């Protein structure tokens, strides 16, 4: 796999779309990706316009019958070859992800490893969630099968540009769907390099297509009559827009995995540094750019809570931040873009103007970089707290008096992705399980910890239940129920009102 650390301007028309098994130059506007740390151009190409998107969808539609009729073993062979190529190019792809996202190299290596692991998990999920089963019913058989939707559009996010779209593409292809993949315009290079591996793995022409671009490309794809469903991972704002765009089209499957305004409740625990480490991992890993990051840190009032916050603030202030390949390795890098950095600083200023108290001021050490330092704001005294997902290294502290109040505060959000509890009291966790309105409920584990072998997703503004991880299989195939009998015979007992005691013709 090539490593184009920086494209020259003459490569603005390099073929970055993959349609019908061919790399093509887009007909849309030229756009580029900059290194979040240095602002140097990493990648540049032309976006897909409406014509390109239509062509990609037509290619996927034409390829669908043969791919759907191929055996599961045939489809799995291609997907397993893709996994083998990921293993072979793990370091190269991890470097590409690090360059585009600014995530440290140690973190992007784990992302590529998760992409590899997704193949085996998807095979298991396909059999468990959407396989073939039959139940005897007297002289017949009740049979359950699953069938692919057809053409699925996959919209990928920028925070995990390899792992998260991979979590939809792999199960979609395994189930027999064909795919049109639209990655985030902030991570086009990772998508391009990943699709090259699919091509090398032998994916048939038209089965997987790549369209690059921003909002216009996404809207064109969502509006295509040739798609049968759409799998989306990203912000609630964009997810709501897609939901409105597909309104009135119940024939199209729409799966939305969006963000969260997640709460981490901190009760008393003996090992204070263990709690601080968990809170740091929950709030600031990936520079706070995970949908499960804790945006709200609920800390009990009193001396123990005060001591925890002092230690938490000190450790956050001392976190090593920097370029993805620096040594010693940083804990976190920059946010995805200068615009994202500006939005985070504006969010901090807004909370301070509302009456928040800064415990640790988030700063931008270099105006020419998207690198931010961690920020902590006590918003306990704000009367009307904005219910927003601030997607970056900024966490809000809310003090509470008792556990009942903490539960109430945790549920005061339109989102419902994740909530966590740090406590040595099992009964408190049992109460949280009963009252939490969230798809992920963790106990003494970071909010950002999740298993690909479990469902992933949330309720409310966090999405329509579990379209990611193990349950992604559910959204990639529809159930077909059959009653089957090999030999038709007249029943021994007829329904009332029916008689065959008639002269035969």
UniProtKB/Swiss-Prot annotation:
Matching CDD domains, A to Z? ALDH_SGSD_AstD
Gene3D superfamilies per UniProt: Aldehyde Dehydrogenase, Chain A, domain 1, Aldehyde Dehydrogenase, Chain A, domain 2
Q: Where is the active site?
A: 257, 291
Q: Which InterPro entries match?
A: Ald_DH/histidinol_DH, Ald_DH_C, Ald_DH_CS_CYS, Ald_DH_CS_GLU, Ald_DH_N, Aldehyde_DH_dom, SuccinylGlu_semiald_DH_AstD
Pathway entry: Amino-acid degradation; L-arginine degradation via AST pathway; L-glutamate and succinate from L-arginine: step 4/5
Give the source species.
Yersinia pseudotuberculosis serotype IB (strain PB1/+)
One Pfam family it belongs to: Aldedh
- Relate the protein's function as given in its record: Catalyzes the NAD-dependent reduction of succinylglutamate semialdehyde into succinylglutamate.
What PROSITE patterns does the database record attribute to this sequence? Answer: ALDEHYDE_DEHYDR_CYS, ALDEHYDE_DEHYDR_GLU
Record family assignment: Belongs to the aldehyde dehydrogenase family. AstD subfamily.
GO process terms (BP): arginine catabolic process to glutamate; arginine catabolic process to succinate
| Protein name, entry field | N-succinylglutamate 5-semialdehyde dehydrogenase
Q: Where does NAD(+) bind?
A: 234-239
Q: Name one GO molecular function term.
A: succinylglutamate-semialdehyde dehydrogenase activity
Keyword Transcription regulation on entry: no
Keyword set for this entry? Arginine metabolism, NAD, Oxidoreductase
Top EC class, one word: oxidoreductase
Q: Which reaction does it catalyse?
A: N-succinyl-L-glutamate 5-semialdehyde + NAD(+) + H2O = N-succinyl-L-glutamate + NADH + 2 H(+)
EC number, as in UniProt: 1.2.1.71
